[in-house]
Amino acid sequence: MTPRADGRPTSHHVRVRDLRLHYLDFGGDGPPLLFLHATGFHAWVWAPYAEHFRATHRVLALDQRGHGESDKPPSGYRWEEFGADLMRFLDALALDRVHVVGHSKGATAIAAAAAAGTERLARAVLIEPVLFAGPLASAPIRESPLAVGAGRRREVWPSRAAMFDSLRPRMPFETWQEEFVRCYVDHGVADRPDGQVVLRCPGAIEAEIYAHAPMTDGFALLERLHVPVLLIGGERSPGLGEREAAEALRRLPAGTLLTVPGAGHFVPMERPREVMEAIARFLAEPRAPTRPT
């Protein structure tokens, strides 16, 4: 596909079994490059990345179940479900040799899709994947701090401008480049009849995702990802520390690591230039990367 003259993506829905999944097609020439967002976000947060990469790739971004303009079923929020959705999405669009980039939950969903059996991936970039190892939970942990906090999240604002002003000085948004905050706000809410705006990803769904996360061994999923993988972490991230990164590299059949100095879990929004450059170098490699000796 060729890029639209105005640079805006086209909006589409595709049926994946009993779900309607929404995605953005930014156009571009070259192999497909698909972006997957983190919990609570949406496809539009990748718009600055799409602008960068559509000179070399056909860029798409997916609203995962429960997010954005995709369906929001009351259940089905384990990592395995997100992985199965991704596999079926690629099948529905008949995309092959796909380069895929995921952040946080989106990164883990890529590994889960590989574990589900997809063979449509060419390369994968996992940015701050969510990785749990044993002992795993046998049931959702709804009293976890993340789940409880998400369940209490404010969902309604008088306007997008009021939402931006409220969120911009707070974590995690205070460390983001401003264009990413505006993408999150502008497209992360829907208009209500009373003139207010409401989150497209309800707090209850976000809470369900966090509650189910400790039920899956994310490190085991990595072992099924038999394509070249670039693992990106933020130096200040509490989730992907040295121990977790080393274990992830041990499990990945063909993985390399980049740690971005001074960045945290939201490194793609905090340090986009460094992340874009790293992704571009990785996607341009002619052969699978080799581990340093």
Give short role names for the model-derived ranges.
Residues 52, 96-139:
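Conserved hydrolase catalytic core segment
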Residues 134-197, 210:
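Helix-rich cap/lid subdomain of alpha/beta-hydrolase
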Residues 19-72:
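Conserved HGGG/HGGXW glycine-rich cap/lid loop of the alpha/beta-hydrolase fold
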Residues 36-38, 103, 233:
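The conserved beta1-alpha1 loop
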Residues 179, 189-250, 259:
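Conserved serine/cysteine hydrolase catalytic core
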Residues 260-272, 276:
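Catalytic histidine-centered segment of alpha/beta-hydrolase-like enzymes
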Residues 1-35, 55-57, 95-96, 280-293:
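Alpha/beta-hydrolase fold catalytic core
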Residues 83-98:
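Conserved acidic catalytic loop of the alpha/beta-hydrolase fold
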